[in-house]
Amino acid sequence: MKSKRLVMFWVVMVVTIILDQMIKAWVRGHLNVGQSWSGGPWHGIFEITLTYNKGIAFGMLQGGGLIMTPIAVIIAGYAIFTIYRNRGESTWATIALGLLASGAIGNLIDRVFNGKDGVTDMFLLRLANITHGKMNDFPVFNIADSCISVAMVMLLISWSKNPVSDKVDPKLAPEPVIEDPAV
């Protein structure tokens, strides 16, 4: 069972990194910055638009993306460490950790190899604002961003269903200290 979870973690992580990088490469090869493509039943609601994000998620902290490089390494390292340390975790948590690592690594690849351009973003959702009767643009995002967002929701749900126990594993508990009354 433990090895199945490890395989699942690595498959989720590797497949989503490859998917993220392939879509980013396709968009960079077929669209110019700011150019959009939209079609089918989602026309006007969902667009593929090439943008570069030099900040963090959803375009915040523009120019502050450099700090995300070490943070991405820490996040990916945390996910990998956790999956090896807690191999008995649920399937849900295993998938979430794979998505978390892949999202961090996917955007890290962009930061390292795109350098000055930043992270490639491409998915644009236009959401209806019923108060003002117009469409509002949701910040442009990519597969890696989606992986991180979905992973965080999954982990929060997993943690709420299985809160961290205060019980100490008997194998890890320290030996009791017996005081010598003669001392």
Predicted feature locations:
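Alpha-helical transmembrane bundles and membrane-interface segments of multipass inner-membrane proteins
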Residues: 1-183
